[in-house]
Each structure stands twice: as structure tokens, then as C-alpha cells.
Amino acid sequence: MTPIPSDRLDAILARHEFVTAQLADGSADAESIVQLSRELSELDGVVAAIRHYRAAEANLAGIRALIDEPGGDPEMRALAAEEKPEAEEALEQAHRALQLMLLPKDAADEKSAILEIRAGTGGDEAALFAGDLFRMYAKYAESKGWRVEVISESEGTVGGYREVVAEVKGRSVFSRLKFESGAHRVQRVPDTETQGRIHTSAATVAVLPEAEEVDIAINEADLKIDTMRAQGAGGQHVNKTESAIRITHMPTGVVVFVQEERSQHKNRARAMALLRSKLFDAERTAKDSARAADRKAQVGSGDRSERIRTYNFPQGRVTDHRINLTLYKLEEVMAGPALDEVIDALVTEHQAELLAAEGMA
């Protein structure tokens, strides 16, 4: 086990004591109370882990002292020797739990998310695959009790989507879906294939934390806002009013388009929320890319050009290339809930990378 510096743990305990005293004092203003309460709720879990770790440390030290005591009671020494493996295991578990609690937190993890799926190479088959991916994430969200709301969609000519953008609302959505960003590849025999040949198609997935107004400031003077009639499949107009909204953020060139609502006002609000999330994500990505380059991270880099996963239908196989994980349960993964097995493995690998970067591996 890599030792955890005692002075670091003492500093956390001291901060917890200080914040508790500040809240008990009652002299802080309302805004400070909110911030202190939030900090205290985060510290409570870490402090409990520190105390558990130190209790496990003390217990093992006591057992070792009994075993090593010269002239000690043989019966007590034998009993201590029996208890030692269990005490060592308990300390190792407490050490691991505390290490994870001490890892740098991603402030966006608690947020809802924006999910974007775009068909890539492969024509109609790519659009169908994009639709399959969207249904997989929708079913996964349902299994978690999250809510999915489509912001914009462009359907494929034979089904699926050329592009679909949706909000996934719920607690800690981003913490689970953030590793899905990247290029997804499918290998299967299309329904239209008469020779039984396997085709390869692709779709790209982007997952952004849903930003709030406090997360990023947008100057209205930087926006170019266009209104137009909403369009359906094939480009035909589906209503006579100009309810669709396209917003361009001039300094960055980021463009968002929303037409799902019949009301122009509602579409504008949704477009602004989407723009906010895109700009917030761009800021985060720039910072994360620098950190990822420093630690040569394989997971969580958020590189959307990277091929991250292959879905091979003839073999019933899902392979995540970042961690060399292969599961022969493609149907279960596409059905939603079994996606947890892939995400859990990615989270574990990401934590290992963070531990190494922090010198705690």
C-alpha cells in the first residue's frame, strides 16, 4: 500500500472542524452558509473514511504488537496471529476507499448531460446505428430513473438518425455517461444486403455536462440569432410559422439549432441552454486535455475522434478499445442496463489513472 501522508489527513480533519464551527457560530451570511453547508456535506464522507482508516491502522498495529511482544502470552499471540489476515484485509479496504475519496473531483459529475449522436461513415446503415445507440442510452437512462428529452433530431431516410441531440436529466448523469464520447463502430449484415456480407459503419457520440447560467456567462452581443420554419425529413417545412431557432456564438463559431417545440420562445430557451453547455464543455475540454496530456490518460480524455468501441453483431461482441474490454453480451448491452458493466470498468480504469497521477497508486 502507498502510504497516505498523515499531514494531509490532519489538514482535512482541521478544515472539517473549522467549517462545522463556522456553521454553528451563525454569523455567516446566507450565501456563505450555502457554500459552507455544501463543503461540509462533501467533507463528512472523507472524514468518516479517515476515521475508519485510522481505526483499521490502529487495530492492525495492536495485533502486530501482541504478536511481537517478547515473553507474551502464547495463547494471546496465537489468537492475534489468527486475526492478523482479517485486520490486514480490513486496512487494505479502508485504504483503498480513502484513496478514492481523496481523488480530485470533477465538478461536472453531479450534473445532467447533453447527449449528441451523429451518423458517420456508412450511409443509411450509419443512421440506423445512430438510432440503435440512442435507444441503448434511452433504455440505460430509464433503468437509472433518468429522463430523456429530445432537443433536436434529423431522421435518416430509412430510419434512425443522421443526428439527434437530447437532454438526459437526473443526478450524476454526466459521471456515468462522460466516457461514452468518441467514435462507435458497428459490424453487421444490413437488412438490404443480399450477399450476406458484413458492413462496417460508424457514429460519433458526444456527452456534455448540462451547464447552468452560473457556470458560464454569455454576452448577448456575441450572438447571431436566426429564425426559420421547422423542417421534417427530406427538408420539407412542417409548419408555417418561423418557430425554429439557430444561434451562432460569433467569437467561437459554435452553432446550435433547435426546432422540436412549436413555440419559438421555447426553442430559443432550449437553444440557449444547449449553447451554454457547448461553451462550458469547450472550456472544460481545454483544461482536461492539458491534464490528460500530462498523465497520458487513456480513459476520460474526451477525444471525440478516437474510436472507442466496436459492436460486432455476428459475434455478439462489444469491445471497448481503451481498456481492451470484450464482452460477449451485445444484446444485453444494447438493451441498456448491461452498459453498466462497460462503464464500471471504465470508471475503475479512470480512477487508477488518477491514483497514479496523484502518486497514490
From Swiss-Prot:
Localization, UniProt: Cytoplasm
This protein's encoding gene: prfA
Post-translational modification: Methylated by PrmC. Methylation increases the termination efficiency of RF1.
Name this polypeptide is given: Peptide chain release factor 1
Cited function: Peptide chain release factor 1 directs the termination of translation in response to the peptide chain termination codons UAG and UAA.
Segments of skewed composition (Basic and acidic residues): 285-309
Pfam families, alphabetized: PCRF, RF-1
Sorted UniProt keywords: Cytoplasm, Methylation, Protein biosynthesis
Residue ranges of the TM segments: none
Organism: Methylorubrum populi (strain ATCC BAA-705 / NCIMB 13946 / BJ001) (Methylobacterium populi)
N5-methylglutamine PTM positions: Q236
Family: Belongs to the prokaryotic/mitochondrial release factor family.
Any one GO molecular function term: translation release factor activity, codon specific
NCBIfam families: prfA, PRK00591.1
GO cellular component terms listed in the entry, alphabetical order: cytoplasm
Region (Disordered): 285-313
InterPro entries on file: PCRF, Pep_chain_release_fac_I, Pep_chain_release_fac_I_sf, Prokaryotic/Mito_RF, RF-1
Entry-linked HAMAP family: Rel_fac_1
